[in-house]
Design a protein with these regions (language model features):
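Helix-helix packing/entry segments at the starts of transmembrane helices
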Residues: 39-42, 80, 95-101, 170-192, ...
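Hydrophobic transmembrane alpha-helices of multi-pass small-molecule transport proteins
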Residues: 46, 51, 69, 109, ...
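Juxtamembrane helix-entry segments on the extracytoplasmic side of multipass membrane proteins
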Residues: 5-9, 33-37, 41, 60-66, ...
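Specific transmembrane alpha-helical segments of multi-pass solute transporters/efflux pumps
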Residues: 19-26, 55-99, 133-135, 220-238
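Glycine-/small-residue-enriched transmembrane alpha-helix faces in small-molecule transporters
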Residues: 1-38, 43, 144-173, 256, ...
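Cytoplasmic-side transmembrane-helix entry/capping segments in multi-pass membrane proteins
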Residues: 13, 64-73, 118-130, 178-187, ...
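Hydrophobic/aromatic residues within transmembrane alpha-helices
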Residues: 30, 39, 86, 112-114, ...
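Transmembrane alpha-helices of multi-pass small-molecule transport proteins
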Residues: 32-78, 105, 163-167, 184-203, ...
Length: 312
C-alpha cells in the first residue's frame, strides 16, 4: 500500500520534531566541553561531506543566488552563533521552551510573505499544540523558568529563532526550484566555510574530548542532517505554515530527552496533560487538514521543484 505524499509529509515533520526536541539537550552536553564555534563548524561539516555528491550537475539561476545567500548566512552562520552562545547563558528548560519560537516565526513569516493560510479547525488545533507545548515546557511553575535571571540568554535564543525563521521562509521559496539535498548542501557549505574562518580567528581549540565525540556526531547526523532533510521535505509537501504548526510538538520530545540524559528529573502531571494535548491536537490537525491542491484558496507554497515532488 502506497503512503500518500501528503501523509509522508506529515510523518516527516513529526519525526523531525523528535530530532528537534533532542537538539537542546545534546547541544548543552556538547557545549560543556567544546567551544560554540567548533560545535557549529563540526555539526555542519559532517552532513556537508555526506551530501556533497548532490552538487553534481546542479544549476542555480542567477536570480536565486541572493535568496540562497540570505538563507545560508542567516540560517547557517548567524543563527548557530546566537543560539549556542545563548544556550550557554540560560537553563535547559528555557532552551526547550524558546526553541519553539522558531516554529512561531516560521508560521508568521509563511502567513506574511508566502501567503499561506489554514482552515479555522487547523488554527484551533494549532492553538492546542501551542498550549500543550507551553504546559510541557513550563509545568506552570514560572518561578523555575528563570526568564529574568537569564534574560540575555533567552533573548539570544529568540534572536536565533528569528534567524532560522527567516532562513526557513527563504528556503521554502527556493525549494520550488532547487532539490532538497543540493539546497541543504549549499547552505551547509556557507556555514562550514564561515566557521572554518571564524574558529582560528577566535583562537578556539579544535580538540574534541573522546567522551563527547559520539554526542557531537549524533548531533550532526540527526539534529542537523536528518532533521533538515525531513524539515525541507515537509515544506515541499504540506507547506511552511503546517510544518511550523507541528514543529512545537518537539517540546514533548525535548522533555523526554532531558529525562533520558538527566535521569533524576521526573515528569509532572501538568507535563503529562500537556503532552496528551499536543498529541491529540496533532491528530486533529491531520484529520481536519485543509485542501492543498494547486488551487487551494490562499496557499502559495506548492511542492514544485525541478526534480518533481517525490524526489529529494
Amino acid at each position: 500500500m502506497k503512503i500518500p505524499q501528503r501523509t509522508r509529509g506529515y510523518l516527516a515533520i513529526v519525526i523531525a520534531a523528535v530530532l528537534f526536541g533532542v537538539w537542546p539537550s545534546l547541544s548543552k552536553r556538547v557545549l560543556t566541553e567544546v567551544h560554540p564555534f567548533v560545535v557549529a563548524l563540526l555539526i555542519q561539516l559532517v552532513p556537508a561531506i555526506a551530501l556533497s555528491p548532490s552538487l553534481r550537475r546542479l544549476r542555480i539561476a542567477r536570480s536565486d543566488w541572493p535568496l540562497l545567500a540570505l538563507s545560508g548566512v542567516v540560517g547557517a552562520v548567524a543563527a548557530p552563533i546566537v543560539y549556542f552562545y545563548g544556550l550557554e547563558r540560560t537553563t535547559a528548560s528555557n532552551s526547550v521552551l524558546l526553541s519553539n519560537s522558531e516554529a512561531l516565526f516560521t508560521i508568521l513569516f509563511a502567513y506574511a510573505f508566502l501567503g499561506e493560510r489554514a482552515t479555522p479547525r487547523e488554527y484551533l488545533a494549532l492553538g492546542g499544540i501551542a498550549v500543550g507545548a507551553f504546559l510541557v515546557t513550563t509545568q506552570l511553575r514560572f518561578g523555575d523558568v528563570q526568564f529574568l535571571g537569564f534574560l540575555i540568554g533567552n533573548l539570544m535564543l529568540v534572536g536565533a529563532a528569528v534567524c532560522w525563521g527567516t532562513s526557513n521562509t527563504a528556503s521554502a521559496v527556493l525549494l520550488r526550484r532547487i532539490p532538497i539535498f543540493p539546497l541543504l548542501e549549499v547552505q551547509l557549505i556557507f556555514g562550514t566555510v564561515s566557521f572554518a574562518v571564524l574558529v582560528p580567528l577566535s583562537g578556539a581549540p579544535l580538540a574534541v574530548p573522546s567522551d563527547i565525540l559520539p554526542d557531537l556526531l549524533l548531533l550532526a547526523a540527526s539534529a542537523v542532517g536528518m532533521f533538515s532533510v525531513l524539515f525541507f521535505y515537509a515544506f515541499r509537501t504540506i507547506g511552511a505554515m503546517r510544518t511550523g504548526a507541528i514543529l512545537p510538538t518537539s517540546a514533548l520530545w525535548g522533555i523526554l530527552a532531558a529525562f533520558y540524559f538527566f535521569p533524576n528529573e521526573t515528569l509532572s502531571v501538568v507535563q503529562v496533560v500537556g503532552g496528551a494535548l499536543m498529541v491529540g491536537s496533532l491528530v486533529v490537525f491531520y484529520l481536519f487538514r485543509g485542501p492543498t491542491e494547486t488551487r487551494a484558496a490562499g496557499e502559495t507554497l506548492k511542492p514544485e521543484a525541478s526534480d518533481g515532488p517525490d524526489s529529494p
